[in-house]
């Protein structure tokens, strides 16, 4: 029934049913992956982090959990990068430049984390979507050669 709710995109019903599933079944990677998807759709990010961590302990190559982390770190880095660059371009002062540099200290490690997850995903399944993300990440990390390589793979 839980899987049926997921397939039919009844996220709230799937979420309610989860508590009724036997504890042993709650350690099944397939069910946990489904529950991660439910939490993602319901925008329960803290729950997603906990579930993804639990799934990766059981299956280090689980696509759903790896995608969660890859996207999480990518968008965290990208959104901060864009907002700080926009602020700096609007007001090119020493203080704004210092703020940009401080933000980049957070941005680059998150891009690297995302890169590592996307590289693993790409190795498992060389999707164009993963290659495009890798191209974007390598562009931000100023590695033009690798960015170009992955952009070509994305076409």
Regions found by a protein language model. Give the residues of each.
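Residue at a conserved register position within TPR or TPR-like alpha-solenoid repeats
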Residues: 5, 39, 73, 80, ...
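Short coil/linker segments at helix-helix boundaries
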Residues: 78-117
């Amino acid at each position: 029934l839980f899987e049926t709710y997921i397939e039919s995109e009844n996220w709230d019903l799937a979420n309610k049913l989860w508590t009724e599933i036997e504890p042993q079944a709650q350690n099944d990677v397939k069910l946990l992956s489904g529950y991660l998807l439910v939490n993602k759709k319901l925008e329960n990010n803290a729950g997603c982090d906990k579930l993804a961590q639990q799934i990766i302990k059981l299956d280090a190559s689980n696509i759903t959990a790896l995608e969660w982390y890859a996207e999480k770190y990518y968008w965290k880095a990208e959104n901060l990068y864009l907002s700080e660059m926009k602020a700096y371009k609007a007001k090119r002062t020493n203080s704004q430049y210092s703020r940009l540099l401080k933000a980049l200290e957070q941005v680059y490690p998150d891009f690297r984390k995302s890169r590592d997850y996307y590289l693993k995903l790409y190795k498992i399944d060389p999707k164009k979507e993963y290659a495009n993300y890798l191209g974007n990440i390598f562009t931000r990390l100023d590695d033009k050669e690798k960015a170009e390589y992955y952009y070509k793979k994305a076409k």
